[in-house]
């Protein structure tokens, strides 16, 4: 009798002991991680084992663990050992593991006729769309692929031999991540008809936009790009054989690529052998950070072309433009560059074989910046006026630009950098945009990450795994991330890229020891406005210390670039609404005491004055970035 009672009791006690040894935990916000066989359950146990203090767990880090359930985790961990088998399950894996992967669009020979209106539509292949439609008509695409990761859209042989009008509004993933949009043989041989792209790919992260054989051999059609690619980050636009052999087909680019970060545009065989075409670029590349544009064989052999660039790359930071074989062998025609290339920091402009062989072309440059190279151009018909021969220090000074008025350049926006003396209770100061612009992703489980290649020497394997075609944006994203991760560290820097949370813990503890705390700014409240500093606390007593900072890098899975940062002071501060004095955020700021190794053109010195090693520089930790320090 007693044996029958004691045996179940012993089993129950053994079960409870086993479960307790597995550190079964329930996360806050109702996020259960009780199953010890999930990636998150494993991560929590790993934290408990490798961090020596009992301070509250950093759920902002632990919640970035892979969302795979136990069954999915076991399945994909087994599959990844066979990369050929794994790549066939890529789409389901990316969806389950919260990764950013491109969709696979299959070719389509379906024909589309009639007037069509597409609203809130995405990830489609339009082939032979609107081909040889007779009579006037109208096709409209509105709110197409909004706020998506890797939206892929292909328009091939679109509107060929058709006089229809086409309008794309809010097209190209406004606010999306890595959109891939291609227009091939668009409006070729069209008699009339117009195309309008309004608010195209605004605010996109790493857009990849291609127009090939666009409006070739067209007659009298007009193509209008308004607010094209604005506020984007690190993207690439290409126009090949655009308006070639056209007759009176005009193109307008208005507010093209404005406020972009490291944007690239290529125009090849643009307006070649065209008759009487007008091309206007207004407010092109305005207020950008290092925009690069290339015009090759632009307007070559045209008859009476008119090219106008107004406020081109104005008020940008650095930037490069190349015009090769521009308006060569043209008959008559006019090209005007007004308010051209007046960047804050000196950029580079190269004009090669410009207007050569033409019949009386008129080329005018008015109010253009420094560091321009003109090779092999028609000297008799080119005029240059109001050349700004300033030093880079002059141009970098905000008070010297635009008639002595201070210009708000978004790349050195107010509050992005500040002095340590600002971190006092009661100080009112601007806060920059600290919102995380990266796509939402999760870490790979370490067991899976360890089995995937991660080096530039194996990039072909990675491209195969992630279905990344050569020269695709996915391939470029992977290559850029790997190159940055393999870059040699700066003097005194220790660095590592981590694609699992366990790797981040290992790196931080290897630099700082096991008694560590990781911090981030609590939310984005106060961003892009004025804030008041409330109570403030110096980490490690406010003494100069060492920290580890981790910043996101664009990659299919969540990837962080972590590096040791010597000689810093770290602060936590309550952030208040300056009017109501209510607490709206809890921020983390880091002050770099030693800036002697920073470049003289670093944005901090443009914003604050002075130079390397002369001042300390502070900044906030942005949303989803992190800083590690030893625990107090």
Swiss-Prot record:
Keywords: Apoplast, Cell wall, Cell wall biogenesis/degradation, Glycoprotein, Secreted, Signal. InterPro entries: BURP_dom (IPR004873), PG-associated_BURP (IPR051897). Residues 417-631 form the BURP domain. SMART domains: BURP (SM01045). It is found in: Secreted, Extracellular space, Apoplast; Secreted, Cell wall. Residues 28-109 form a propeptide. GO terms for biological process: cell wall organization. The keyword Amino-acid biosynthesis does not apply. Its main location: secreted. The keyword Cell wall biogenesis/degradation applies. PROSITE patterns: BURP. Glycans are attached at residues 125, 143, 258, 280, 336, 371, 389. One of its GO terms (cellular component) is apoplast. Disulfide bonds: none annotated. Residues 1-27 form the signal peptide. Interacts with polygalacturonase to form heterodimers. Non-catalytic subunit of polygalacturonase. This is Polygalacturonase non-catalytic subunit AroGP3. It comes from Solanum lycopersicum (Tomato). The lineage of its organism: Eukaryota, Viridiplantae, Streptophyta, Embryophyta, Tracheophyta. The gene is GP3.
């Amino acid at each position: 009798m007693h044996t029958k009672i004691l045996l179940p009791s012993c089993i129950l006690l053994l079960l409870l002991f086993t479960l307790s040894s597995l550190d079964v935990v329930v996360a806050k916000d109702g996020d259960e991680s009780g199953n010890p066989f999930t990636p998150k359950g494993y991560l929590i146990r790993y934290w408990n084992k490798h961090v020596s203090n009992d301070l509250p767990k950093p759920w902002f880090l632990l919640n970035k663990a892979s969302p795979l359930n136990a069954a999915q985790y076991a399945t994909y961990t087994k599959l990844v050992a066979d990369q050929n088998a794994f790549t066939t399950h890529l789409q389901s894996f990316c969806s389950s593991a919260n990764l950013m992967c491109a969709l696979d669009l299959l070719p389509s020979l379906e024909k589309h006729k009639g007037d069509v209106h597409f609203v809130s539509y995405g990830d489609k292949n339009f082939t032979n769309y609107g081909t040889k439609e007779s009579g006037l008509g109208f096709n409209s695409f509105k709110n197409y692929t909004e706020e998506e990761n890797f939206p892929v859209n292909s328009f091939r042989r679109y509107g060929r031999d058709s006089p229809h009008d086409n309008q794309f509004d809010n097209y190209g993933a406004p606010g999306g991540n890595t959109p891939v949009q291609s227009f091939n043989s668009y409006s070729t041989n069209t008699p009339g008809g117009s195309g309008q792209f309004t608010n195209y790919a605004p605010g996109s992260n790493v857009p990849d936009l291609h127009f090939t054989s666009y409006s070739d051999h067209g007659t009298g059609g007009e193509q209008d790009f308004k607010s094209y690619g604005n506020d984007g980050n690190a993207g690439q636009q290409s126009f090949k054989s655009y308006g070639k052999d056209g007759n009176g087909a005009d193109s307008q680019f208005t507010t093209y690529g404005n406020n972009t970060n490291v944007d690239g545009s290529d125009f090849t065989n643009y307006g070649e052998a065209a008759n009487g075409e007008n091309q206007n670029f207004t407010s092109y590349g305005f207020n950008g950070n290092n925009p690069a544009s290339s015009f090759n064989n632009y307007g070559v052999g045209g008859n009476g072309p008119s090219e106008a660039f107004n406020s081109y790359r104005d008020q940008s930071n650095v930037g490069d433009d190349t015009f090769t074989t521009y308006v060569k062998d043209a008959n008559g025609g006019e090209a005007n560059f007004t308010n051209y290339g007046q960047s804050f920091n000196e950029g580079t402009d190269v004009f090669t074989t410009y207007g050569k062989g033409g019949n009386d072309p008129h080329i005018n440059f008015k109010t253009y910046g420094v560091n321009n190279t003109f090779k092999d151009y028609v000297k008799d018909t080119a005029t240059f006026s109001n050349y700004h021969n300033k030093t880079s220090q002059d141009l970098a000074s905000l008070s010297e630009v635009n008639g002595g008025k201070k210009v708000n350049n978004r790349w050195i926006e107010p509050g992005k950098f500040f002095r340590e003396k600002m971190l006092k209770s009661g100080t009112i100061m601007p806060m920059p945009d600290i919102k995380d612009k990266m796509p939402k992703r999760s870490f790979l489980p370490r067991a899976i990450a360890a089995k995937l290649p991660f080096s530039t020497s194996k990039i072909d394997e990675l491209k195969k795994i992630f279905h990344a075609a050569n020269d695709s944006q996915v391939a470029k994203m992977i290559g850029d991330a790997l190159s940055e991760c393999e870059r040699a560290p700066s003097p005194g820097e220790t660095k590592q890229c981590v694609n699992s949370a366990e790797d981040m813990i290992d790196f931080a503890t290897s630099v700082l020891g096991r008694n560590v705390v990781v911090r981030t700014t609590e939310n984005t409240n106060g961003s892009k406005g004025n804030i008041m500093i409330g109570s403030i606390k110096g980490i490690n007593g406010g003494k100069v210390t060492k920290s580890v900072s981790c910043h996101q890098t664009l990659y299919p899975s969540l990837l962080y670039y972590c590096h040791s940062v010597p000689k810093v002071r770290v602060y936590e501060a309550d952030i208040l609404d300056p009017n109501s004095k209510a607490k709206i955020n809890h921020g983390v700021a880091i002050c770099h005491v030693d800036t002697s190794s920073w470049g003289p053109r670093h944005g901090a010195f443009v914003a604050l004055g002075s130079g390397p090693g002369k001042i300390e520089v502070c900044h906030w930790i942005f949303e989803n970035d992190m800083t590690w320090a030893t625990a107090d």
